[in-house]
């Protein structure tokens, strides 16, 4: 307690309090909810703790995720299980070269019987949307989805329809099969708050997956419906609001901006992160803080967020790419070169 002002003492690292900021008590409750969701997902998605944390942080931040991983690593399973934890609707689109924008958003159809136009909603009208192999559809179809992601609404024949929140797109890419694909342009990649890499699990986790799947003769895979629903969609919306109101002091904001500016000035980088990259760093930093039960962002939150937030926003110069330089190593080196503030 501050004796001169008769106000509660401020937490170290937190900004001065205001009515619109998340309180430590609210952060603690939200962190408990996150732990429940995290625990349920870990029951059916083994050995991928970091992936689960990153996807959950993106949901709290109200962002969309680009998932990259080889086939058979459980991307669909993860998204369906996440939807089940809060009773949300799940939708899936398999992107193919012949997929049309109306296959994504929906269309109007004239009903001969009633002599009226009927609205047919597309699969984007859901809470969690899995856009499988998004880079296999042509640019026009990709753009239709990315517009929905940005605007949170669909326009069909001049009629604008709002999506029911929460809405999150998780788009997948296969890093191996690139033949016949349409790479996402940089401006569209920038719409994803994170690029999450799903790798093979460790041996113990892989043995557990194989053991569970082969326990029953009729089993075709892990059961994403085995997770328990621990909250409602409105609880996710409340957590997103509290996440947005987590405190980020000017020094932490400056740190995020400095990291992004450093990517633009670094030798060997042909394209650095833009302002949206710094915004995403703060948004994910707030999510990490909330998941930890804190009402303020620390420099460590920003540093932890930097790799998944920036890896798809930064491009190596051709000579480094040809030599086999890894983009993750380049980003990590840049982040480590930027001095973190002491707050």
Residue ranges and their predicted role:
Residues 54-57, 110-130:
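Conserved alpha-helical scaffold flanking the Walker A/P-loop in AAA+ ATPase domains
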């Amino acid at each position: 307690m501050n004796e001169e002002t008769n106000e509660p003492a401020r937490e170290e690292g937190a900004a001065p309090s205001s009515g619109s900021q998340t309180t430590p008590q609210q952060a603690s409750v939200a962190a408990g909810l996150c732990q429940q969701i995290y625990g349920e997902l870990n029951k059916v998605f083994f050995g991928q703790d970091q992936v689960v944390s990153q996807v959950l942080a993106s949901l709290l931040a109200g962002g969309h995720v680009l998932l990259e991983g080889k086939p058979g690593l459980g991307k669909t399973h993860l998204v369906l299980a996440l939807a089940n934890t809060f009773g949300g609707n799940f939708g899936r689109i398999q992107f193919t070269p012949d997929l049309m924008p109306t296959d994504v958003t929906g269309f109007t159809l004239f009903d001969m019987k009633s002599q009226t136009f009927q609205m047919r909603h597309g699969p984007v009208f859901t809470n969690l949307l899995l856009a499988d192999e998004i880079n296999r559809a042509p640019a026009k179809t990709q753009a239709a989805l990315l517009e929905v992601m940005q605007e949170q609404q669909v326009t069909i024949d001049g009629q604008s329809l709002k999506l029911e929140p929460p809405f999150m797109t998780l788009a997948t890419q296969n890093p191996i099969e690139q033949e016949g694909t349409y790479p996402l342009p940089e401006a569209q990649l920038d719409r994803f708050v994170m690029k999450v890499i799903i790798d093979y699990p460790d041996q113990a986790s892989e043995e557990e997956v194989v053991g569970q799947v082969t326990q029953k003769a009729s089993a075709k895979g892990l059961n994403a419906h085995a997770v328990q629903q621990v909250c409602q969609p409105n609880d996710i919306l409340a957590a997103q609001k509290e996440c947005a109101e987590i405190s980020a002091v000017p020094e932490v904001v400056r740190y995020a901006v400095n990291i992004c500016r450093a990517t633009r000035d670094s030798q060997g980088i042909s394209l650095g992160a833009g302002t949206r990259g710094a915004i995403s760093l703060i948004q994910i930093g707030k999510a990490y803080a909330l998941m930890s039960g804190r009402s303020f962002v620390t420099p460590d939150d920003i540093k932890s967020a930097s790799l998944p937030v920036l890896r798809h926003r930064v491009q190596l110069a051709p000579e480094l790419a040809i030599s086999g330089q890894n983009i993750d190593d380049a980003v990590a080196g840049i982040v480590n070169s930027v001095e973190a503030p002491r707050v």
